[in-house]
Amino acid sequence: SEQQXGRDVGGAL
């Protein structure tokens, strides 16, 4: 996710 710099399971950059 964007909260995690885009490298989490959310996948959003």
UniProtKB/Swiss-Prot annotation:
GO cellular component assignments: extracellular region
GO biological process: chitin catabolic process; defense response to insect; polysaccharide catabolic process
Catalytic activity, as annotated: Random endo-hydrolysis of N-acetyl-beta-D-glucosaminide (1->4)-beta-linkages in chitin and chitodextrins; Endohydrolysis of beta-(1->4)-linkages between D-glucosamine residues in a partly acetylated chitosan
Post-translational modification: Glycosylated; contains galactose.
GO MF term list: chitin binding; chitinase activity; chitosanase activity; endochitinase activity
Listed transmembrane segments: none
Subcellular location: Secreted
Domain Chitin-binding type-1: 3-13
Major localization listed first in the record, in broad terms: secreted
Key words of the record: Carbohydrate metabolism, Chitin degradation, Chitin-binding, Glycoprotein, Glycosidase, Hydrolase, Plant defense, Polysaccharide degradation, Secreted
Disulphide bridges: none
EC annotation from Swiss-Prot or TrEMBL: 3.2.1.132, 3.2.1.14
Role played: Has insecticidal activity when consumed by D.melanogaster larvae. Has low chitinase and chitosanase activity.
Protein name: Insecticidal protein LA-b
Organism: Morus alba (White mulberry)
